């Protein structure tokens, strides 16, 4: 059994998961099936990865009950102003809720995208709200203007890099850090 963390809204999130960045749809589907068979219970995807539908197929093929799987995905910046963007991810994933949905980048009208997440959270379509790759003035703007503080930030974090300023700015609202490149990457 994998260890979980508790988010500030009491949602349980697995400590370890598998990401589907740079996977083709076929690779993502099989990776999800294999990861779930090995005991992983968190799967991360994004609209920009263009494999949400494949992740949903992998979840269904796995035979693991949906309520035992934690799915996170991200709204891409070009979709922040698009009506129905959360619902499109729900449809592609083949699920009636998403455990954690992120704003993928602090670009464009990211506050419009964040407001969509707040609305979806209130409607029960998503269980937690996340931000990805935020720091500095854009992070400050988001924290100043949002109604619901983010539950998770996904950011680069590993033994060679730790953004203490961003982590400290989010600590008062109980925001958890989710690392991408948690072990670093090939150029270190």
For the regions a protein language model found, what residue spans apply to each?
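N-terminal binding-site loop/beta-alpha segment at the start of enzyme catalytic domains
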Residues: 1-69, 83, 183-186
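Alpha-helical scaffolding within the catalytic cores
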Residues: 2-5, 53, 59, 85-89, ...
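Conserved, mostly hydrophobic/aromatic
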Residues: 18, 35, 43, 55, ...
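Short, acidic/polar
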Residues: 23-36, 79-94, 110-112, 137-141, ...
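A structural motif
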Residues: 40, 95-98, 126, 150
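A short, structured active-site edge motif that brings together acidic residues
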Residues: 66-79, 99-106, 133
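CE4/NodB-like, metal-dependent polysaccharide N-deacetylase domain
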Residues: 82-103, 119-123
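Beta/alpha (TIM)-barrel catalytic core signal, keyed to glycine-rich beta->alpha loops juxtaposed to Asp/Glu
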Residues: 105-188
């Amino acid at each position: 059994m994998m260890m979980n963390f508790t988010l500030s809204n009491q949602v349980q999130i697995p400590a370890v998961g598998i990401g589907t960045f740079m996977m083709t749809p076929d690779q993502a589907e099989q990776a999800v099936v294999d990861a779930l068979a090995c005991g992983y219970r968190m799967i991360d995807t994004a609209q920009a990865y263009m494999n949400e539908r494949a992740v949903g197929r992998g979840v269904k093929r796995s035979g693991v009950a949906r309520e035992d799987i934690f799915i996170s995905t991200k709204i891409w910046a070009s979709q922040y102003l698009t009506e129905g963007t959360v619902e499109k991810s729900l449809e592609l994933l083949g699920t009636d809720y998403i455990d954690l949905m992120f704003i993928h980048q602090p670009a464009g009208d990211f506050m419009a995208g964040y407001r969509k997440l707040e609305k979806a959270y209130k409607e029960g379509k998503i269980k937690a709200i996340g931000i990805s790759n935020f720091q500095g003035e854009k992070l400050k703007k988001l924290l100043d203007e949002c109604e619901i503080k983010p539950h998770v930030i996904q950011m680069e974090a590993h033994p060679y890099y730790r953004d203490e300023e961003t982590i400290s700015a989010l600590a008062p609202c109980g925001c958890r850090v989710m690392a991408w490149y948690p072990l670093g990457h090939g150029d270190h």
